[in-house]
Amino acid sequence: MSGYPGAGYNGGGYVPPPQPQYGGYYPPQPAYNAYQQPPPQQQQYMVYHQPSPGPQQHQHWNPQQQTPAPQGYGNPPNSHYGRPEANMPTVNSNSYAHGNHQAPPPPPQAPQQFGYGAPADYAFRYSQCNGRHKALLIGINYFGQRGQLRGCINDVRNMSSYLVEHFRYKREDMVILTDDQQNPMSQPTKQNILRAMHWLVKDARPNDSLFFHYSGHGGQTKDLDGDEEDGYDEVIYPVDFRQVGHITDDEMHRIMVRPLQAGVRLTAIFDSCHSGTALDLPYIYSTQGILKEPNLAKEAGQGLLGAISSYSQGDLYGVANNIMGIFKKATGGNDAHARTLATKTSPADVVMFSGSKDDQTSADATIASQATGAMSWAFINALKKNPQQSYVQLLNSIRDELQMRYTQKPQLSCSHPLDTNLLFVM
């Protein structure tokens, strides 16, 4: 069971948006006492496909812009995302394992090296994704606030249903935070989001598969620790950000990436503006599968990453302090890049698909008369059309779904060097 209060949608269907309280959202919530079992998840939310999304672009969000006229998301249309003809592949059941050696091979089980320049005892492992599955899904429409969105809650419904129907996820192992829920613990406040992030990675073991999905406003703020080449941190905006502030990529990396052991998978989907490096993952790939960032040895230099070999001894939290001591005088450019590579790599298997690069906005879309995020729709639809895809094939498929109507270019990033020709499993 999830062990998280307020997980999911209160059982019997979603409730209407809450009446505005404290500016359209609930005041900061008191701390949880003991984690409790969530209510049963009985409502099955439908998911959708067929028409391509209409071009409804929202530009980079200015929190001071005027609130649009409220637009409800309405009842779900009758169309569905259809089930794929074959089940989603696993490491043991896939086209390659069944004799088609032209298909993408499953991930290897042996430890993998980061490459020249990294300590010999510092390795990562691909997850086999056959352990426990947990998911955290966040959708924020910002009801009654400036910059209100229409499709983010629908994104969460669609994604949660897709995970349950096509992967090994269970409702009781999901936490869903949306701003249409009456339970204060299920509101996407900053406190609830941070607590849920800790819940997601708690007690994760090798070959577990964790899933994080965020649909809402994203933006940029001035970088304060010198780890961003462009001088800006990427941020997400909780529903109560005007009172308690945003959440930075540094904080999300510290909570959800740094504690993970080798062989734990975290798959993250960000459907927000300026989200290309929202988890601060140092390896970034193009649609051709080419590493867009220089490799570890070129930037960091041989021996520079010696301190992070403490990962292999289990000292996951002492790593950053050691490395930051080496780089404390670095300010930008190549030095900032080297610091990012030194502190943001991980022996875990963290993969992120984002709706846009750091300098791009993302789009709201309309699909079968339902508002939804373009990236969330494209991810589901691409896998529905072809479950047996490599990472680079999936990235290309997502871009193919978007390119006819949108300028945004989704991006693939990873915590370790990624063989993009391997089978995508989750």
Curated annotation (Swiss-Prot):
<dbReference type="GO" id="GO:0006915">
    <property type="term" value="P:apoptotic process"/>
</dbReference>
<dbReference type="GO" id="GO:0004197">
    <property type="term" value="F:cysteine-type endopeptidase activity"/>
</dbReference>
<comment type="function">
    <text>Involved in cell death (apoptosis).</text>
</comment>
<dbReference type="GO" id="GO:0006508">
    <property type="term" value="P:proteolysis"/>
</dbReference>
<feature type="compositionally biased region" description="Gly residues">
    <location>
        <begin position="1"/>
        <end position="14"/>
    </location>
</feature>
<feature type="compositionally biased region" description="Low complexity">
    <location>
        <begin position="21"/>
        <end position="68"/>
    </location>
</feature>
<feature type="active site">
    <location>
        <position position="217"/>
    </location>
</feature>
<dbReference type="InterPro" id="IPR029030">
    <property type="entry name" value="Caspase-like_dom_sf"/>
</dbReference>
<comment type="similarity">
    <text>Belongs to the peptidase C14B family.</text>
</comment>
<feature type="region of interest" description="Disordered">
    <location>
        <begin position="1"/>
        <end position="111"/>
    </location>
</feature>
<dbReference type="Pfam" id="PF00656">
    <property type="entry name" value="Peptidase_C14"/>
</dbReference>
<keyword id="KW-0378">Hydrolase</keyword>
<keyword id="KW-0788">Thiol protease</keyword>
<dbReference type="InterPro" id="IPR050452">
    <property type="entry name" value="Metacaspase"/>
</dbReference>
<protein>
    <recommendedName>
        <fullName>Metacaspase-1B</fullName>
        <ecNumber>3.4.22.-</ecNumber>
    </recommendedName>
</protein>
<dbReference type="InterPro" id="IPR011600">
    <property type="entry name" value="Pept_C14_caspase"/>
</dbReference>
<keyword id="KW-0645">Protease</keyword>
<keyword id="KW-0053">Apoptosis</keyword>
<dbReference type="GO" id="GO:0005737">
    <property type="term" value="C:cytoplasm"/>
</dbReference>
<feature type="active site">
    <location>
        <position position="273"/>
    </location>
</feature>
<keyword id="KW-0865">Zymogen</keyword>
